[in-house]
Amino acid sequence: MSTGHSKAAKEFLKNQTYAKWHDATFWSVRTKRDNMAYGLEEWEQLREKASAIKRHTITHLDEYLDQFATNAEKNGCIVHWAKDAKEFNHIVYTILKEHNVKKMVKSKSMLTEECEMNPFLESKGIEVVETDLGERIIQLKGQKPSHIVMPAIHLNHDDVGELFEEKGISTEKGNHDPTYLTYRARLSLRNEFLTADAGMTGGNFGIASTGDIVVCTNEGNADMSTSCPKLHIAAIGLEKVIPNYDCLAVFQRMLCRAGTGQPTTTYTSHFRKARPTAEPMHIILVDNGRSEWIGNPEHWEALKCIRCGSCMNTCPVYRRSGGYSYSYFIPGPIGINLGMLRDVQKHSGNVSACTLCLSCQTVCPVKVNLGDQIYQWRQQLDDFGTANPQKKLMCKGMSMVYGSQGIYNLGTALAHWANLIPSPLMNCGLNPWAEGHKMMEFPKKPFHKLIKDLEK
């Protein structure tokens, strides 16, 4: 009954020392989140408010998108609409080509990961430099993010130190001190900022009432990406638009507390228009399936997500299997749901990567019903033609047993004879349960028989 996720998780767990470190690291972030939440008496009210704002905005998205675009254009920005990833990449390339851009620096953006923008631009001869430290590390390593907020969390300081030595960023061989490595990365990135022809940012929020793009970072790289080059391109998904600054105040109090256990991000950057001496600012609003997802009655609330990553930090499966065990580029509970919205045939294997503990729903700052949605996806696998045939057979057998009182009574009466089966026969490859579990010992008397005996 293996899935792509379970097979990848098995590889992840081969290094038990690393697996335990990974689990403990993310649980510590979850603990920091809890401490921050407990420090605000109004935390649950904020969650309710944030959820209500998102529900309202998404169900009136056409109005707010029109308002945002109108105000952005009044500010002097050039607004583009991209229906899918292909059109988005084409728009970005066209803008860069018109300005003879050879190198572009960019701050963190999961949207560009979604649209696979970097490899597209590189195939056109344009160098793209990630400026978020974690993103830069995995870019140099040729990897994808393993977490949406902490993309290089799966690497330790020795991994990074060796990488920096290989790339010529670090000059002191064997010096893997994090402070030193950060210093060397800063020097390297400073040169990239100063020699770039264009800068790109994503956006945590788009403010409809003003046309502003708001970017939250801890490193200030979004500011550097827009202050040094003369051309600024901002790209956001349609769902990132919110009504006004009063709404932003709610999300600003929650985003970082939920994601990393900090009171707020170090930098909150507001972009309304280009600098006086710069080229006009370009804003790209990307659909790429979102308008279709809004029409899904059971799963549209996944669009409320503000990409804080708290569902991953708390998820017992993500913590013990890693981000690369998932087939979708966003891992964890939110990634399971978004992946299924994207392509049920490709990502159905992820829905088993959930214990239905609902911890993700407990911590989500905008109250996305992540676990409930995963449960709903599981009920639909047979309709999609992606249900596991072994599980289907097992469920039919269980239905037969529990649907017949006689068969059930016979099974419970004879169950203890299974204790006599030699262990090598039970704990073999033909019994998936034996991997990671010990077979239970069946009592001689089933529970209902014990109760009847007590009642005599």
Each model region followed by its residue ranges:
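Extended amphipathic alpha-helical segments enriched in small hydrophobics
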Residues: 308-312, 357
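Intrinsic disorder at enzyme termini
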Residues: 1, 5-25, 39, 394-456
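The feature marks the mature, well-folded catalytic cores of soluble enzymes
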Residues: 1-298
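Ferredoxin-type iron-sulfur electron-transfer modules in oxidoreductases and energy-metabolism complexes
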Residues: 275-302, 318-427, 435
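Helix N-cap / loop-to-helix initiation motif
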Residues: 84, 311, 369-370
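Phosphate-binding glycine-rich loops and their immediate beta-loop-alpha structural context
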Residues: 305
